[in-house]
């Protein structure tokens, strides 16, 4: 699997940036098919725990660390993407099952998610919107896969 959520056009099914798609597929093949000891894909959700009004997320395939990143794809004639200052793409919900956009921070190899609108959080979703703006990556520049912690 290769995550391409960050290399496409939100109004087109097929990403214009074929290079990064191919590069990511090749990394996955090198790891999975050929057994190379490399980071072959982006962070994958592993588990969550609740601590007070926060949800703590853990991941596999994170490499040495999780980082905020930007899309490698820059449309012709556009300036480079600015360096992100805030982790985006996370929604959080409580018992009412209503998701709101959340604050998220990277702490070591975990992501801490919270919102002042959700006192007792139960679930997190990442990348759950049309044309989501997601910026969680590993240090190799590979994006995290969208995920959900609920089954609602």
Model-derived regions, located:
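C-terminal beta-sandwich/jelly-roll accessory domains of carbohydrate-active enzymes
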Residues: 63-152
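Catalytic cores of secreted or luminal carbohydrate-active enzymes
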Residues: 1-88
